[in-house]
Curated annotation (Swiss-Prot):
UniProt signal peptide: none
Protein name: Phosphoglycolate phosphatase
HAMAP family, per the entry: GPH_hydrolase_arch (MF_01419)
Keyword Thylakoid: no
Entry keyword annotation includes Hydrolase: yes
Keyword field: Carbohydrate metabolism, Hydrolase, Magnesium, Metal-binding
GO MF: magnesium ion binding; phosphoglycolate phosphatase activity
Positions that bind Mg(2+): 8, 10, 178, 182
Summary of the function given for this chain in its UniProt record: Catalyzes the dephosphorylation of 2-phosphoglycolate.
Similarity section: Belongs to the archaeal SPP-like hydrolase family.
Organism: Methanospirillum hungatei JF-1 (strain ATCC 27890 / DSM 864 / NBRC 100397 / JF-1)
Amino acid sequence: MLRGVITDIDGTLTDEKRRLSTAAIETIRKLQEGGIEVVLSSGNTSCLLKGLCKLIGTGGTFIGENGGVYRIGFQGSMQVMANRDIAVKALNLLEEYYGKKGIRLELYSHQERYSDIAFAREVPVEEVRSLLSGWPVDIMDTNFAIHIHEAGIDKGRTFHIVAEQLGIKPDEFLGIGDSENDIGMIKAAGTGCCVANAQEDVRNISDYCSSVPYGEGFVEIMRMYFPHILAR
């Protein structure tokens, strides 16, 4: 029996302009009120996720920075899963390389990140991976940003820790997302789903893909798996 939902945000709870879907928010509130633990899981910062948990209406548990940080409930302390130093050193190499080409990397929320580096998708991600080949880092393309973090960190690994601390088995969760950074999380959940705008590799490992994209697709899937709550 499903007791929880772990969901990506950008591209999953939003529309094509990255605006939060009000239908998705209302659905999450109904799930939470119906006894389903909803966990937000994102590549974004803990600062943003703390606010979103409160404003959307979850129980306060989140995974941020693609698994690099997490918090259990509103009263929990934020935990950091990775050493950011190696990501910063990798960034220094990239800035030197691209600087010689007259390209300046646009960093995202640099001062608010504890475990990773994120920057705009203005350079080819495969080139970044090639430049950092042999480094103990992982490069993640979320469709919204390129992320660098210590090797071995991802949403799926941290999800196992979060599930244990919540007292809910991973196979009692429905996982849903749209990008490559969601694959580990979707695989770790008992039921894995994606929205219609998902990348092909995400669609290939999902149990079900919605017929409509973005937040409306999220709502479709939640209604399919939780009719006893959302039919009210």
